[in-house]
């Protein structure tokens, strides 16, 4: 994918959202670090795990890239993927400030719903939407609604994964699907604005 951001939901949207959610979760992942590493290896996108962030200095003074995407080496310029990782890091920092607004009871309820094997993906998205409705009152008044919704969606995913690390894969998939269905135009605009 070049520097142009995808317009619709599809492979481009999934790529962007996978990177965004993974990057958000990777910040402060102490409770589910191993599960996140496994997930990162399974994703069909370039993800940065700890240790991948530092490029080695070469003898000619340039930095060697460790960027791989589907087995191909990607260019060294600040790519869309790097922009998305930076956005994820920024959103995770904002999420740290909102962390207290999510009640442990809500996290336990959402985790229990995700553990219910009979729920469809749509049912899980609906459970996530209901949980978001419960925390809407705690959105900061000075923050755009879409930004607050995006942060809280990923923050709920992080809290459920922290509560029950075995749910990480399901929570990740549901979160990506929820964002692609409800918030992708906002995510796309965030990426476009950062790339300009």
Curated annotation (Swiss-Prot):
GO terms for molecular function: ubiquitin protein ligase binding. Keywords: Acetylation, Apoptosis, Cytoplasm, Membrane, Mitochondrion, Mitochondrion outer membrane, Phosphoprotein, Ubl conjugation. It comes from the Eukaryota. The modification N-acetylmethionine is found at residue 1. It is found in: Cytoplasm; Mitochondrion membrane; Mitochondrion outer membrane. InterPro entries: Bcl-2-like_sf, Bcl2_BH3_motif_CS, BID. A motif (BH3) lies at residues 87-101. The modification Phosphoserine is found at residue 79. Gene3D superfamilies: Blc2-like. The record marks 60-61, 76-77, 99-100 as: Cleavage. One of its GO terms (cellular component) is mitochondrial outer membrane. GO terms for biological process: apoptotic mitochondrial changes; establishment of protein localization to membrane; extrinsic apoptotic signaling pathway; glial cell apoptotic process; hepatocyte apoptotic process; mitochondrial ATP synthesis coupled electron transport; mitochondrial outer membrane permeabilization; negative regulation of intrinsic apoptotic signaling pathway in response to DNA damage. Induces caspases and apoptosis. Counters the protective effect of BCL2. Forms heterodimers either with the pro-apoptotic protein BAX or the anti-apoptotic protein BCL2. Interacts with PLEKHN1. Intact BH3 motif is required by BIK, BID, BAK, BAD and BAX for their pro-apoptotic activity and for their interaction with anti-apoptotic members of the Bcl-2 family. This is BH3-interacting domain death agonist. It comes from Rattus norvegicus. The lineage of its organism: Eukaryota, Metazoa, Chordata, Craniata, Vertebrata. The gene is Bid.
């Amino acid at each position: 994918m070049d520097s142009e951001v995808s317009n619709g939901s599809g492979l481009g949207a999934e790529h962007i959202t996978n990177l965004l959610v993974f990057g958000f979760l990777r910040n402060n992942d102490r409770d589910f670090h191993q599960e996140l590493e496994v997930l990162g290896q399974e994703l069909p996108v370039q993800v940065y795990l700890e240790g991948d962030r530092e490029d080695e200095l070469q003898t000619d003074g340039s930095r060697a890239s460790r960027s791989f995407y589907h087995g191909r080496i990607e260019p060294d310029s600040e790519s869309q993927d790097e922009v998305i990782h930076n956005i994820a890091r920024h959103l995770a920092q904002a999420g740290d400030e909102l962390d207290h607004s999510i009640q442990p009871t809500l996290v336990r309820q959402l985790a229990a719903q995700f553990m219910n094997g009979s729920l469809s993906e749509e049912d899980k998205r609906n459970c996530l939407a209901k949980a978001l409705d419960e925390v809407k009152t705690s959105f900061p008044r000075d923050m755009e609604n879409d930004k607050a919704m995006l942060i809280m969606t990923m923050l709920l995913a992080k809290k459920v994964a922290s509560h029950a690390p075995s749910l990480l894969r399901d929570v990740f998939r549901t979160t990506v699907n929820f964002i692609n269905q409800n918030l992708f135009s906002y995510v796309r605009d965030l990426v476009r604005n950062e790339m300009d």
